[in-house]
Amino acid sequence: MAKIIQLSDDLSNKIAAGEVVERPASVVKELMENAIDASSTVVEIDVEEAGLSSIRMIDNGVGIDAEDCKLAFQRHATSKIKDENDLFRVRTLGFRGEALPSIASVSHLEMKTSTGEGAGTHLVLQGGKIISEKKTSGRRGTEIVVTNLFYNTPARLKYMKTVHTELGNISDVVNRIALAHPEVSIRLRHQGKVLLQTNGNGDVRHVLAAIYGTAVAKKMVPLHVQSLDFEVKGYISLPEVTRASRNYMSSVVNGRYVKHFPLVKAVHEGYHTLLPIGRHPITFIEMKMDPILVDVNVHPSKLEVRLSKEQELHELIKQGIKDVFQKQQLIPSASVPKKAPMPAIKNEQQSLTFDAKKGNTNEMETPLSYEPEPLESVVYETNQMSTYGMPVQEMTGASSPVFREDAPSERVHKEESAASLEYEESVLREDDAEAISENERVPVMYPIGQMHGTYILAQNERGLYIIDQHAAQERIKYEYYREKVGEIEQEVQEMLVPLTFHYSKNDMLIIEEHKEILTKVGVFLEPFGSGSYIVRSHPQWFPKGEEAELIEEIIEQVLVEKRVDIKKLREEAAIMMSCKGSIKANRHLRNDEIKALLDELRQTKDPFTCPHGRPIIIHHSTYEMEKMFKRVM
């Protein structure tokens, strides 16, 4: 008796649906991609109970011809590709011909479609089988309603998350597709409540504002670099705007949102030490390339891709981001509380609000008598910021990057007009031009004194500056050590008393395997008995008293990483040395020492953050100070 049988179409579609339709968000993604491929300029999505009850998608695309409607629900039937050559030059979002049959096989599906010429078609399917077909009248476009999702696959239904989680996944998908296609007007509603509305004018800045709020959108700067093979453009947040999750980082390849970790890594390397440890920027990066350089036929979900010349693209993104921030003045401003009537005192914790509007510099009075003579400065005001790296919406408990029903301030059509966003960005561009022309990213500051032996207070005609003295010297020393450590030199310092290090036999095998790498960084290990090494010299740049700890740290990196990145090793060594050798808290400095420290800081390449990404300088403008003291209203 034969053991191998041909699976039925119904069972085959259910198996395929397991890969294509993982959750309601998968249905939304596939239907939106079909709508965009159909040249739609308006797409409306209505969901009930996070899509488990109903998903309704309406578009104004080209529609489907009557003779093609039934075929559209057959597996691997598509209008996107014709032959094998097309498969390697995919220019559409869909191409596999699996979405509609997979969705229909695990739901009740109803479709009305019309090309605008003659009668349209109305199909009703259950479990992938057509149970009703009739002609209908209607405008050009397609309407698809999916209900009772996973009704015939209870195992999949059992593993669905909460309504809030599934709705968050849907919002995430819609938001990223909206970013990838700002030329399409997209509206997402849940239970009749609008979660996202974009205007489809083609300006991605307005989509960013609609998703993250204008306060965040104003703190994002444009990125645009290109090479012979790649064009990279988008918007990246200033280092002061960070999140605890990578979910706020969006990558788009030829109009397709993708998840590709090497691209995320390139962005992080571009920010380098500007980001605090464990924090991530908000970014939207769109990459355009010849379709032959990208393979999208990796997984049925089409989220994964393989890229040719990936290292070239990696370097282009990394260097592009570095170049952007070299032209920016990155001193974050302190926030000013929003003016509001005094609330009644209650026996409960009161929430804080912040003023999102920027002070008008034209209203600033002439410098007060205690200020030095006016200096030319490149400092411009930034907007709503509660603490470094934590914008207001994070403090109010909005943790999801995409679904925040309780954060109306993050919706541009409810907060500020698009004209306001454009005006603010034009102001930032003017300030950038000033910074470039004056070639002075950190203004001259005049020391006032110290606070708690930890923070330096300084001033100029623009207001008050608070400088973390440890972070400032850490940046100075880091750049010094990074240059020294970065040099491949064989100069070593002999030690009067050799150092001994003990390791297990397994660790010694790893060390022996990577001994050549250790030698390149100036660490020479000699076997010394069983399970021990002796070191008689060290690189000349090692600071006195730190030799043993540095050597141990370098060897530990070899043991943990297995494959050692020498550049990363030297980077970590420079960070460690700069941190250990910098001024500690409660160290009181003389005014001449403070002035020397500030002068050295101004000479560094990245004077705004320490090597760990913490801010060095916080700015309180004169206007903000006067507003707090009610000198201006």
Curated annotation (Swiss-Prot):
A Pfam family cross-referenced in the UniProt record is MutL_C
Q: Please give an example of a GO cellular component term from this record.
A: mismatch repair complex
Keyword presence, Transcription: no
UniProt cross-references to SMART domains, sorted A to Z: DNA_mis_repair, MutL_C
What domain of life? Bacteria
Q: Which SUPFAM superfamilies match?
A: ATPase domain of HSP90 chaperone/DNA topoisomerase II/histidine kinase, DNA mismatch repair protein MutL, Ribosomal protein S5 domain 2-like
- Could you cite one Gene Ontology molecular function of this protein? mismatched DNA binding
Function as written in the Swiss-Prot or TrEMBL entry? This protein is involved in the repair of mismatches in DNA. It is required for dam-dependent methyl-directed DNA mismatch repair. May act as a 'molecular matchmaker', a protein that promotes the formation of a stable complex between two or more DNA-binding proteins in an ATP-dependent manner without itself being part of a final effector complex.
- Similarity-based family: Belongs to the DNA mismatch repair MutL/HexB family.
Recorded protein name is DNA mismatch repair protein MutL
Organism expressing this protein natively: Bacillus pumilus (strain SAFR-032)
